[in-house]
Amino acid sequence: MTVMKFDLIKKEGKARRGKITFPRGDIQTPAFMPVGTYGAVKSLSPVELKEMGAEIILGNTFHLWLRPGTEIIKKHGSLHGFNGWDKPILTDSGGFQVFSLGKMRKLTEEGVTFKSPINSSKVFLSPEISMQVQRDLGSDIVMCFDECTPYPATEKEAKESMELSMRWAKRSKEAHGDNPSALFGIIQGGMYEHLRDESLAKLKEIDFDGFAIGGLSVGEPKEDMIRILDHTAHQMPEDKPRYLMGVGTPKDLVEAVYRGVDMFDCVMPSRNARNGHIFTSEGVIKIRNSKYKDDTSPLDPNCDCYTCKNFTKSYLHHLDKTKEILGSRLNTIHNLTFYQNLMKSIRKALDEGRFSEFRKEFLASYK
């Protein structure tokens, strides 16, 4: 029996306003989850994440399993005890990271054998091992182990990949056993609507605490992503959280909420920050461009983050040029605050019954 509870508070069209409750805290949805691959959101402390409004973060099963290993994390009680984040944590299953290894992996019915990116030793990961690792991490939301279908994939390839993921989903559920953490199933099927339907039907049969859409934002054109979202999101169970994995840009988030998605994660705000790409209410600023060298305005006059209240574009340009660590940190604080503020604005618009109006205005002003 899971300790998670989901309340659907309000709907506007397909867009949903909800709340996910855990013993460690509530998550107001739609929600964006900052990614803490190795247990930390790069350059930020748990206090800073809370200040910007994050209520849940994501940890990476694959990377934490390889380093430092679950024995060390278990000595701290859980990943929460290890990294000092006392609110909910979602851990992915490691399936996407294995997919990212490409030719360095060998896939069988049992699981995946691959060379460790740390020391090149031979490593084996299966649904059962993934569930045990996530149990050891003590995460609040556990993702079932799947194979992320590559793009492009023929219909035959997408079908075989999806069917393997469904067999692994069943094994994940069995291995999850009496773990009170929530277990989410992942819909696969590539760019083929009928395969997505088959996948969702099988996952409903197995029965999960929440449902995720996987295999998007893997290199496909934006119109394909929207087509699959249009087809799939509203068919997911109404009474359970809906999670779109690894997406995306601010526009992607607004468009996915419009189609009925509740939860998101993406490395984009933090990774882009380190490369000098800043999200603002009017679009993206590339802070290393020379035009910002003597620009004394803040990154975004509509933002109340620490960076915008205290520093100019000129200073941030200087930090970027001199490769100062502080530059990456200040950019990350801003970008993740921007994402959390966007989710707050979306939730407020849904609360007030004006989300479709908000969406139109946002898509018109955000370049």
From Swiss-Prot:
Q: List GO terms (cellular component aspect).
A: cytosol
**Which residues does substrate bind?**
D92, S93, G94, G95, F96, D146, Q188, G215
Against Pfam families, the record matches this protein to: TGT
From the UniProt entry, list the residue stretches annotated as the region RNA binding: 246-252
Swiss-Prot/TrEMBL catalytic activity? 7-aminomethyl-7-carbaguanine + guanosine(34) in tRNA = 7-aminomethyl-7-carbaguanosine(34) in tRNA + guanine
Which residue positions are annotated as catalytic?
D92 (proton acceptor), D265 (nucleophile)
Q: Which cofactor does it need?
A: Zn(2+)
Q: What are the protein's UniProt keywords? A: Glycosyltransferase, Metal-binding, Queuosine biosynthesis, Transferase, tRNA processing, Zinc
Give the binding site residues for Zn(2+): C303, C305, C308, H334
UniProt GO BP: queuosine biosynthetic process; tRNA wobble guanine modification; tRNA-guanine transglycosylation
Pathway terms, separated by semicolons: tRNA modification; tRNA-queuosine biosynthesis
**Enzyme Commission code(s) on record:** 2.4.2.29
Q: Does the keyword Transferase apply?
A: yes
Q: Which InterPro entries match?
A: ArchSynthase1/Queuine_TRR, TGT, TGT-like_sf, tRNA_ribo_trans-like
Q: Give me the comment on cofactor binding.
A: Binds 1 zinc ion per subunit.
Enumerate the GO terms in the molecular function aspect.
Answer: metal ion binding; tRNA-guanosine(34) queuine transglycosylase activity
- Keyword field contains Lipid biosynthesis: no
Q: Family per UniProt?
A: Belongs to the queuine tRNA-ribosyltransferase family.
Q: What does this protein do?
A: Catalyzes the base-exchange of a guanine (G) residue with the queuine precursor 7-aminomethyl-7-deazaguanine (PreQ1) at position 34 (anticodon wobble position) in tRNAs with GU(N) anticodons (tRNA-Asp, -Asn, -His and -Tyr). Catalysis occurs through a double-displacement mechanism. The nucleophile active site attacks the C1' of nucleotide 34 to detach the guanine base from the RNA, forming a covalent enzyme-RNA intermediate. The proton acceptor active site deprotonates the incoming PreQ1, allowing a nucleophilic attack on the C1' of the ribose to form the product.
Q: Cite the record's note on assembly.
A: Homodimer. Within each dimer, one monomer is responsible for RNA recognition and catalysis, while the other monomer binds to the replacement base PreQ1.
Return the protein name: Queuine tRNA-ribosyltransferase
Which organism is this protein's natural source?
Francisella tularensis subsp. tularensis (strain SCHU S4 / Schu 4)
**What lineage does UniProt assign to this protein's organism?**
Bacteria, Pseudomonadati, Pseudomonadota, Gammaproteobacteria, Thiotrichales
